[in-house]
């Protein structure tokens, strides 16, 4: 609950409470109404079964089905349910800088959570038997590694299931459920449970309650004795009576504490909440840490708010929500954003800002739709990102590629680039379709990830064309490795591009041909060959007709 040890976690929590106080609500009445509904309507024999499941060292698909069925029953009995209300944020309610910051933080959070789920208990990671796990624990103890309290002597609890996605949103505690379980399974009066949890909640206004605090408070409130002494961990179900679950329940019972747990999110105030959250983040210099481990307070609230878009992010039932925070809250830069520098307006009247026809736009859209965003897509350009003259996108798994040219604005710089790099002659691209390169970039899918050899120019190109949402994977091969297959690629695929006809000189030696020119398309093929260790075997196939790429080669009317 407290997050990472190297940050002022509770101070961050207090600052978030103050900064988001306008969005907190009084939840005690709603929580108690749902708790009574669960007491009356829930089959607690099923609750006991699920609690036994969560104590097992290895859990199966049948165990997961029991958990999901019970979660569905709980959701049906509760009023405090989170609704699936996916949000797409655009420039307007939030500034472009705020949207960029939010997108970056969600991406970092995605990497952190995915790393945790791959490397920590709770997700199936192998086939160790119980005997092997016990033996491993004994080895660790013999080497002086003491097991922490609540970790069951190192026994790892894993989900041995077919579809790990079925685990998403099936965990996390709900105050109404915690109160109901403590009342029924502990044979306690609900009023006594409320009093004990309220005491924990009041303590939570000044510090994170710990196990020592729990021990002392249990002497006064016997109902607190039912709270487990295990430390909090990932994939703890709402049916585990953990300290974190009890503290969360207590927070909801304290009226006037501006507790984060009582925040209620509605679609019409979603952007305002995010804006306030980012403001507090800057004041306290909060951040998303990509180190594996529990979420810090900023990471926790960011994930919870962005998960459903409507409801109680901390305390409402969310088991019927699909997707993760980064799936359900997306950043859309495709509208209300000026893409690249505006074209000059000539004296005397109207000009078409987009030089392409609607039919040509449709051809581009269809071509891009054939690139699978979940598979590797190479990108390369020739010329500087501020004045590119060639663009190529290539997908190795299908052989599909998009390849186009553009007339330069800076002819002097272009000639220098031709002389020492790409070898393109101006006369060979004088009929290149105006506006095609930028429209291809604009129509690429949102948040696409492109693979490249050297990312600085690609990133700048995307930013200049209004596509900062597109990210890159830079393989950063050494030059010799990157161009190892150069001659083989040119020999096999050189006929794909006939626009590099100039002599290319070496910058290192005075005079003399430096070898093959740099072609954006063939470089993509060459980099893929360097990555795979052999030349691509799938025949490259163009997605754009030459009649669109070059005006003079028109065969059919576009």
From Swiss-Prot:
Q: Which residues bind Mn(2+)?
A: 380, 382, 523
Known InterPro entries for this protein?
Nucleocapsid_arenaviridae, Nucleocapsid_C_arenaviridae, Nucleocapsid_C_sf, Nucleocapsid_N_arenaviridae
Pfam families linked to this entry: Arena_ncap_C, Arena_nucleocap
- Family statement drawn from the similarity comment of this UniProt entry: Belongs to the arenaviridae nucleocapsid protein family.
For this UniProt record, give its keywords in alphabetical order, as a comma-separated list: Capsid protein, Helical capsid protein, Host cytoplasm, Host-virus interaction, Hydrolase, Inhibition of host IKBKE by virus, Inhibition of host innate immune response by virus, Inhibition of host RLR pathway by virus, Interferon antiviral system evasion, Manganese, Metal-binding, Ribonucleoprotein, RNA-binding, Viral immunoevasion, Viral nucleoprotein, Virion, Zinc
Q: Which GO terms describe its molecular function?
A: hydrolase activity; metal ion binding; RNA binding
Specify which residues bind Zn(2+) according to the UniProt entry for this protein. Answer: 390, 497, 500, 519
| Record bears the keyword Metal-binding | yes
EC number, UniProt record: 3.1.13.-
Identification of the protein by name: Nucleoprotein
Q: Where in the cell is it found?
A: Virion; Host cytoplasm
Question: Which parts of the sequence are annotated with region: Binding site for the cap structure m7GTP?
Answer: 54-236
Tell me, what does this protein do in biology? Encapsidates the genome, protecting it from nucleases. The encapsidated genomic RNA is termed the nucleocapsid (NC). Serves as template for viral transcription and replication. The increased presence of protein N in host cell does not seem to trigger the switch from transcription to replication as observed in other negative strain RNA viruses.
Which HAMAP family would you find in this protein's record? ARENA_NCAP (MF_04085)
Point out the annotated site residues (description: Important for exonuclease activity).
Answer: 457
From which organism does this entry originate?
A: Oliveros mammarenavirus (isolate Mouse/Argentina/RIID 3229/1990)
Keyword Manganese among record annotations: yes
- Mention any one GO cellular component term assigned to this protein in its UniProt record: ribonucleoprotein complex
- Domain text from the record? The N-terminal region is important for the cap-binding activity while the C-terminal region contains the 3'-5' exoribonuclease activity. A CCHE zinc binding site is present in the C-terminal region and may thus contribute to the substrate binding and/or the specificity of the exonuclease activity.
What's an example GO BP annotation here? Answer: negative stranded viral RNA replication
Per UniProt, subunit arrangement is:
Homomultimerizes to form the nucleocapsid. Binds to viral genomic RNA. Interacts with glycoprotein G2. Interacts with protein Z; this interaction probably directs the encapsidated genome to budding sites. Interacts with protein L; this interaction does not interfere with Z-L interaction. Interacts with host IKBKE (via Protein kinase domain); the interaction inhibits IKBKE kinase activity.
């Amino acid at each position: 609950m407290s997050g990472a040890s190297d940050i002022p976690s509770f101070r961050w929590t207090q600052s978030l409470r103050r900064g988001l106080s306008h969005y907190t609500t009084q939840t005690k009445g709603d929580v108690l109404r749902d708790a009574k509904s669960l007491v009356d309507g829930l089959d607690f024999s099923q609750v006991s079964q699920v609690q036994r499941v969560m104590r097992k060292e290895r859990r199966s698909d049948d165990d997961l089905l029991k958990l999901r069925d019970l979660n569905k029953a709980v959701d049906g009995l509760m009023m405090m349910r989170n609704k699936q209300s996916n949000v797409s944020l655009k420039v307007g309610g939030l500034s472009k800088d705020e949207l960029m910051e939010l997108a970056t933080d969600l991406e970092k959070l995605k990497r952190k959570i995915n790393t945790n789920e791959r490397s920590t208990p709770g997700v199936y990671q192998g086939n160790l038997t119980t005997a092997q796990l016990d033996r491993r624990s004994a080895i660790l103890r013999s080497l002086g590694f003491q097991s922490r309290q609540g970790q069951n002597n190192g026994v790892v609890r894993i989900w041995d299931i077919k579809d790990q996605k079925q685990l998403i949103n099936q965990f996390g505690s709900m105050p109404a459920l915690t109160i109901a379980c403590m009342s029924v399974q502990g044979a306690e009066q609900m009023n006594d449970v409320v009093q004990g949890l309220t005491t924990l909640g009041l303590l939570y206004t000044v510090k994170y309650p710990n196990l020592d605090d729990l021990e002392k408070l249990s002497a006064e409130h016997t109902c607190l004795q039912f709270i487990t002494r295990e430390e909090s961990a990932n994939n703890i179900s709402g049916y585990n009576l953990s300290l974190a679950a009890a503290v969360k329940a207590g927070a909801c019972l304290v009226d006037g504490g501006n507790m984060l747990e009582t925040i209620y999110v509605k679609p019409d105030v979603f952007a305002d909440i995010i804006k306030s959250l980012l403001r507090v983040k800057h004041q306290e210099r909060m951040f998303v840490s990509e180190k594996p481990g529990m979420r810090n307070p900023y990471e926790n609230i960011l994930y919870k708010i962005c998960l459903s878009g409507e409801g109680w992010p901390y305390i409402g039932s969310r088991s019927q929500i699909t997707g993760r925070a980064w799936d359900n809250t997306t950043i859309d830069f495709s509208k209300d954003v000026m893409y690249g520098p505006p074209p000059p307006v000539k004296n005397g009247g109207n000009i078409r800002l987009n030089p392409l026809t609607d039919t040509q736009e449709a051809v581009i859209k269809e071509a891009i739709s054939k690139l699978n965003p979940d598979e590797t897509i190479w990108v390369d350009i020739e010329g500087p990102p501020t004045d590119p003259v060639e663009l190529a996108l290539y997908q190795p798994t299908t052989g599909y590629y998009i390849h186009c040219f553009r007339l330069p604005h800076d002819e002097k710089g272009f000639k220098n680039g031709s002389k020492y790099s790409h070898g393109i002659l101006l006369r060979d691209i004088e009929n290149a379709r105006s506006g095609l390169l930028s429209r291809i970039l604009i129509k690429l899918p949102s948040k696409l990830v492109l693979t490249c050899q050297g990312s600085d120019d690609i990133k700048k190109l995307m930013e200049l064309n209004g596509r900062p949402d597109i990210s890159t994977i830079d393989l950063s091969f050494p030059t010799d490795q990157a161009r190892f297959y150069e001659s083989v690629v040119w020999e096999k695929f050189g006929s794909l591009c006939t626009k590099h006809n100039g002599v290319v000189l070496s910058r290192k030696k005075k005079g003399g041909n430096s070898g093959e020119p740099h072609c954006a398309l063939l470089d993509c093929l060459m980099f893929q060959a360097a990555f795979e260790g052999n030349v691509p075997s799938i025949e490259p196939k163009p997605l754009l007709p030459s009649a669109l790429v070059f005006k003079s080669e028109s065969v059919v009317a576009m």
